[in-house]
Amino acid sequence: MQQTKKLTHSDITIAVMSGPFLQRGEPALVSKWYRTKMALACGVDLVVELPYAFSTQKAETFANGAISILNALHVSEICFGSEDGQIENFYNTISVQKNEEETFNRLVKQFMNAGNSYAKATSEAFLHILSSEKNIDMSQPNNILGFQYIKAILMQNSSMQAQTIKRFASHYHDETFNDQHIASATSIRKQLFSENSSFKEIEPFIPKATASLLASYKQNYGTLHNWEQYFSFFKYKLMTMSPEDLRHIYEIEEGLEHRILSKIQTSSSFHSFMEALKTKRYTWTRLQRACTHILTNTTKEEIHCANIEQHAPYIRLLGMSQKGQTYLSKNKKKIELPILTHTKTFDHPTLHIEQKANSVYFSIIQEPLRTQLLKQDATHHPIRYDETTAKFL
């Protein structure tokens, strides 16, 4: 965050944040409201939600939704972390792909026909068409997402500029702490759910406010969220579904439904199910997203109605500092998308999916807290933060 502010000289900082489920197809550790508090306490001025229909998607759709929201908010510059760290290389890679589009598409098809996943086929195709050191490594997850951010900016004819910060020490999927001060999200999550989990182990790697809010959430609601806690619900749902039922679920391709129903029979945990399910063609992340759609009962028809090929249909405001509130007041008339401070009176297919996802997310919380959280989510107004006193209002 501090590096971003230093690099961009920004007046205000806006974060577009996933809701209950994340792009890699798993539940967020804590609710979006607690994560909003974390972001505000760490210097973000406006926190807005990326709807489920965009947030639990491949990088291209995820980026398209996020950029459309930032565009609507009249953001002048974005900043993202990447393994490469040189913004010129991203633009150069996009240019090469555009010039070699026919060859690139042919190679992707060729590698997929050989049994590779789309992600692997795309990565291999890039290796074949990219030869200069001025191109990015498209096998790295943050490079891929950054590439799609810039591609979305260009596709949406935005005047937004892009900056990137190089990720050091820890890689995105590292499962252990390899540095004294920097850790991957994967390693932090693994530590939190280990047998001898302790918040003290992760404190050196996260802001003090984040550690405090994580501990507070677990104390208040009795848990942090991961896939294993939803496995009994997930297995029950699959055991009552037919192949035809599964085929209606978003991201379930023909043939995958039979493999899923077969492997669930002998799986006693989500991890063992995923180990049995994954293949060369279907990556872990791709399958986790499909499993998320099964859990939330998100159908192909619902995603079609959400019209994800276009921009996000609204802006759900989750939190703001006083500086962020001033920015919104000054620019409200210029912002063309509706800004939602709650969702109880707004109706849209994208929001219907969001409401289901929230209901599923809180299903592991014990009553009566579960019902309270579900009622609050639709009526919850944006969290306000006074950055001068470092207090929530």
From Swiss-Prot:
Q: What is its main location?
A: cytoplasm
Asked if the keyword Cytoplasm belongs to this entry, the reply reads yes
**Where is the protein found, in the record's own terms?**
Cytoplasm
Which family does the record assign?
Answer: Belongs to the TmcAL family.
User: Which GO BP annotation is one of this protein's?
Assistant: tRNA modification
Official protein name in the record:
tRNA(Met) cytidine acetate ligase
What is the top EC class of this enzyme, as a single word? ligase
Q: Which HAMAP family match?
A: TmcAL (MF_01539)
In the record, which residues are listed under signal peptide?
A: none
The record's keywords, sorted A to Z, are: ATP-binding, Cytoplasm, Ligase, Nucleotide-binding, RNA-binding, tRNA processing, tRNA-binding
Name the chemical reaction catalysed here.
Answer: cytidine(34) in elongator tRNA(Met) + acetate + ATP = N(4)-acetylcytidine(34) in elongator tRNA(Met) + AMP + diphosphate
The task this protein performs is described as:
Catalyzes the formation of N(4)-acetylcytidine (ac(4)C) at the wobble position of elongator tRNA(Met), using acetate and ATP as substrates. First activates an acetate ion to form acetyladenylate (Ac-AMP) and then transfers the acetyl group to tRNA to form ac(4)C34.
- Superkingdom is Bacteria
This protein's gene is called tmcAL
Catalytic activity, EC:
6.3.4.-
Q: Which GO terms describe its cellular component?
A: cytoplasm
Query: What's an example of a GO molecular-function annotation for this chain?
Result: ligase activity, forming carbon-nitrogen bonds
At which positions is ATP bound? Answer: 81, 142, 167
Say if the entry is tagged with keyword Lyase.
no
Which Gene3D superfamilies does this UniProt record tie to the protein?
HUPs (3.40.50.620)
